[in-house]
Amino acid sequence: MRHDNDSWDITTSVGSTALFVAASRALEARKPDPLAVDPYAEVFCRAAGGDWAGLFDAGADPKPDHVLFSEFGEQFVNFQGARTRYFDAYFAAASDAGVRQVVLLAAGLDSRAYRLPWPDGTVVYELDQPRVLEFKREVLAERGEQPVAQRREVAVDLRDDWCAALTAAGFDPARPSAWLAEGLLMYLPATAQEALFSGIDALSAPRSWAAVEESVPMPAEVFAYKREEERAAGEEGTFFTLVYNERHAPAERWFGERGWAAEPTSLADYLTRVGRPAPVDDPEFGAMISAIRLVTATKG
């Protein structure tokens, strides 16, 4: 169960979800027709060791009961491939528009500073818990990897004064910026999401961009059942006990009321657009597909 001042590293609580997502991206990259290729996703899983490394060991059978090799896992990998492709394209468009400041909120194991073809002069600010950033930095440094853009770590909890920490790291609010909140909002209570959006708006000059992944809350009784099901299966801390199921202002409306032009895309529509199944009627995965929207906004 979450509490207001909890913290984590890469293998505990919210931090462990970054490994789950990285494993999904790595499995997507192994497909003959991947939607996105993250060459570092498998590297992070191997560095974490244990079951995470075991998913990719040559000649070893994956754990037969690992969720990523279930029907749900297959759909989740499709989702991660599509989500990665969408936000990669978002950054390409922002870069083409002349934006040279990028902010990754709750960066986790995002490797875009290393794998995207950033224009010269681009600075990528990565905000996350100190131990999460440390893990990523050490793993990639050990391999001799160098970021394409200038990468600046901002070790801060997004429930604290992250705006001050970001500007102290060199971020210039007078210049256009591109923001990303990917796989983040569900881990924030509604009040924290409001504060996050307000911070983005306050620090964004005209011609800035913002992209978020958001979801509609589940019915309370369904959410309570899912939490109890997770506990009963001995999987507490996997997902439902980590997220907040609170109603919040939709990103399209919130940014639109403040002078941004926001365009939402449903996950189901985007999956179809990129040639992946969108089983909205599936009893296990359908609710998630139907609930998620990917939103891009630009500030006039």
Swiss-Prot record:
<comment type="similarity">
    <text>Belongs to the UPF0677 family.</text>
</comment>
<protein>
    <recommendedName>
        <fullName>Putative S-adenosyl-L-methionine-dependent methyltransferase Mkms_0379</fullName>
        <ecNumber>2.1.1.-</ecNumber>
    </recommendedName>
</protein>
<dbReference type="InterPro" id="IPR029063">
    <property type="entry name" value="SAM-dependent_MTases_sf"/>
</dbReference>
<dbReference type="InterPro" id="IPR011610">
    <property type="entry name" value="SAM_mthyl_Trfase_ML2640-like"/>
</dbReference>
<dbReference type="GO" id="GO:0032259">
    <property type="term" value="P:methylation"/>
</dbReference>
<feature type="binding site">
    <location>
        <position position="128"/>
    </location>
    <ligand>
        <name>S-adenosyl-L-methionine</name>
    </ligand>
</feature>
<keyword id="KW-0808">Transferase</keyword>
<keyword id="KW-0489">Methyltransferase</keyword>
<comment type="function">
    <text>Exhibits S-adenosyl-L-methionine-dependent methyltransferase activity.</text>
</comment>
<dbReference type="Pfam" id="PF04072">
    <property type="entry name" value="LCM"/>
</dbReference>
<dbReference type="GO" id="GO:0008168">
    <property type="term" value="F:methyltransferase activity"/>
</dbReference>
<feature type="binding site">
    <location>
        <begin position="157"/>
        <end position="158"/>
    </location>
    <ligand>
        <name>S-adenosyl-L-methionine</name>
    </ligand>
</feature>
<keyword id="KW-0949">S-adenosyl-L-methionine</keyword>
<dbReference type="InterPro" id="IPR007213">
    <property type="entry name" value="Ppm1/Ppm2/Tcmp"/>
</dbReference>
